[in-house]
């Protein structure tokens, strides 16, 4: 097939052409926290459908996700329903996990994480099962869907907020990852959280009820 050589036009440069996934970013320039920012980010994801892969059934994708600033207001309310007291904003970290479907293996992995957290001088606050809608997934994605859970970890009083706390969380994460090979840590931070999965771009907002 003949290759079409494109000339420079405006800001376009052929040398910057790549066959990769799409990416987008949305921020509020005044730093105002709003669900509108999340909604706009999800629209960007949905507009990048042409950059995403699909399997033969047309209902299972090759992966899509979104990274968000942790909403203290949202998680304080969600955790209260679970009987988890998370304290003040950025005084806690959230780990997002893909656990195995097997109940015993999942219980073992959760217990191992709790032990590691305590060993690192952090306080484990509790688990929250992430509310999802499996019905929107394709057959293949639904068959291998992990158990998605969030862990809440309290910041020690003698540790500063922000990077210092996140470093401590990272150490706990890495130790857990090296000790367990059947659980995937999606994210772990006191500032950001990631929601993602092997589904189509339009399924991201409908699969995760948190969004």
Predicted regions and their residues:
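N-terminal segments that mediate ammonia production and transfer
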Residues: 1-211
């Amino acid at each position: 097939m003949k290759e079409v050589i494109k000339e420079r036009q405006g800001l376009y440069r052929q040398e910057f052409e790549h066959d990769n996934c799409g990416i987008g970013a949305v921020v509020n320039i005044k730093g105002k926290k709003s669900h509108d920012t999340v909604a706009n980010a999800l629209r960007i994801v949905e507009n990048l459908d042409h950059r995403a892969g699909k399997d033969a059934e047309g209902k299972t994708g090759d992966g899509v996700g979104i990274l968000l600033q942790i909403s203290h207001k949202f998680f304080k309310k969600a955790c209260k329903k679970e009987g988890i007291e998370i304290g003040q904003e950025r005084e806690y970290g959230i780990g997002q996990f893909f656990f195995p479907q097997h109940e015993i293996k999942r219980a073992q992995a959760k217990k191992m994480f709790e032990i590691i957290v305590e060993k690192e001088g952090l306080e484990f606050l509790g688990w929250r099962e992430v509310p999802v809608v499996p019905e929107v997934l394709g057959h293949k994605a639904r068959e291998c869907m992990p158990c998605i859970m969030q862990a809440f970890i309290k910041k020690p009083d003698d540790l500063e907020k922000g990077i210092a706390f996140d470093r401590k969380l990272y150490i706990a994460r890495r130790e857990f990852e090296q000790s367990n090979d059947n659980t995937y840590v999606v994210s772990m931070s006191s500032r950001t959280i990631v929601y993602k999965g092997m589904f189509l771009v339009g399924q991201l907002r409908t699969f995760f009820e948190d969004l």
